[in-house]
Amino acid sequence: MKLLKRLVSVFAIVLAVGSNAFAGDEVRIVIDEGVDGARPIAVVPFVGSAPEDISKIVADDLRNSGKFNPIAVSQMPQHPTSAAEVNPEAWSNIGIDAIVIGQVVPSGNGYSITYQLIDTVGASGTPGTVLMQNSYTVTNKWLRYGAHTVSDEVFEKLTAIRGAFRTRIAYVVQKNGGSQPYEVRVADYDGYNQFIVNRSAQPIMSPAWSPDGQRLAYVSFENKKSQLVVQDLNSGSRKVVASFQGHNGAPAFSPDGSRLAFASSRDGVLNIYVMGANGGTPTQLTSGAGNNTEPAWSPDGNSILFTSDRSGSPQVYRMDASGGNATAVGGRGSAQISADGKTLVMINGNNNVVKQDLTTGVSEVLSTSFLGESPSLSPNGIMIIYSSTQGLGKVLQLVSADGRFKASLPGSDGQVKFPAWSPYLTK
């Protein structure tokens, strides 16, 4: 048995600043469209009880990816508690080729979580083979994290893609009233364990993660002007890195974390600049007619996507990271490239989230929600979070990159916008 604490050292950093600033009204996933075309799988209810339902969390994670469609407990032909009890034929007869079983039992001041992933059709050689198994000891506080760890391991074993269920999201909440209605918050990717990073009487916009997950850059209108702030999530310390005349916005860390791209109208026209992540003299990358904003780095750091209306209406362009050689990509704005460099996600002219295959140029609409904004990819490129308008307010939406699964994360205490998905927070 290994202690899960060994795995959470980096992840725990993002909890430190929020330890005394817990936000009680969390955003939670509400399913809008299911995953009927995805791979069926069974997550059998784990034996034992704990403050969190481990098997439900695992099933929800797998469903949220769009890759799997966990069957209902009522459809399961048996509830085995160990590999020896599994009847492979009973599962294969209903189209299930893999099942997850496990148990959760008290252990000291926490719980021991044990699971097995079992092949029921013999794809690995023999039906009933244990494909993966593991055991963790966690405190009550880390029970959901323990479940997400199971999900990550099962997902990677079955898809050969690293799981991203132990990542987090940052976003801005504009509360309904109060002296400091604007807040930057961070939560688990599914909306749980939310806490406040910073609150202000003035607007806050566009949080962006550093590639090591230890800092957030965002726009603050404190002192009645737009400033770029970088905040350390371990210590809580904040530093204003850009406070130039005019507007300063849309920060984006370079892939190595050493630089910030941002938009500024310091010279009267909104252009893209780059400077050190701790501030310094900026280098201007764009020029000429039109406004240029929303920079986003390519994974290799060699190019930058941005939004410009230089041609008369907003669309996405791509240029060298040093400036120059700008070419139109399409869409309307808010572009981001997946970590493997193969897929572009952006907002199109109808305010829908679309993905574009950068090899073939083929685009696919993933959302048809009203006024989609600020799409952000999970680090494995499997899920996308964005904001949209519902009624008179803003909410977060989750969609799998294949479009199979759609869900909303409504906030109960205000408008929720500017989501940003963290990088991986574990080694």
Swiss-Prot record:
Signal peptide start-end: 1-23
Keywords (A to Z) from UniProt: Cell cycle, Cell division, Periplasm, Signal
SUPFAM superfamilies on file: TolB, N-terminal domain (SSF52964), Tricorn protease N-terminal domain (SSF69304)
One biological process term in Gene Ontology: cell division
Pfam family, one: PD40
GO CC annotation: periplasmic space
Coarse class of the protein's main subcellular location: periplasm
Domain of life, source organism: Bacteria
Subcellular location: Periplasm
Family per record: Belongs to the TolB family.
Physiological role: Part of the Tol-Pal system, which plays a role in outer membrane invagination during cell division and is important for maintaining outer membrane integrity.
Complex formation: The Tol-Pal system is composed of five core proteins: the inner membrane proteins TolA, TolQ and TolR, the periplasmic protein TolB and the outer membrane protein Pal. They form a network linking the inner and outer membranes and the peptidoglycan layer.
Listed name of the protein: Tol-Pal system protein TolB
Native species: Haemophilus influenzae (strain PittGG)
Source lineage: Bacteria, Pseudomonadati, Pseudomonadota, Gammaproteobacteria, Pasteurellales
Encoding gene, per UniProt annotation: tolB
